[in-house]
Amino acid sequence: MKSRIARVALFLGLLAASAPQTVLALDLLRGQRVYNMHCSVCHGLNGVPVIQQAPSFATKERLMQPDMVLVQSVKMGKTIMPPFMGILKDDEILDALHYARTLR
């Protein structure tokens, strides 16, 4: 009986330990999808802008701002960037930002 309890406890512990990584991977996949659909048109698939006015994400300087500042920028728009309020939800924007931070 004790060995069965130990096995169940071990299984639950391993399951709990792996859950955040799985969630993170799914968030990055969602972020990649959102980024490729909405952001890459100007910021490029690899974070190097395809239009001169778009900031580079390859250097990461623009992405060092706090998440909520960047979410507001995306929602409200900036200079030539259109607003995405009503188009993207906050969690989609965050996923795209987290994905953009992985670009090199």
Each predicted region: which residue ranges?
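Axial heme c-ligation environment in periplasmic c-type cytochrome domains
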Residues: 50-58, 73-104
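Gly/Gly-Pro-rich "capping" loops immediately C-terminal to redox-active cysteine motifs
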Residues: 28-32, 44-73
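Short pre-active-site segment immediately N-terminal to redox-active cysteine/selenocysteine motifs
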Residues: 27, 35-41, 46, 77-80, ...
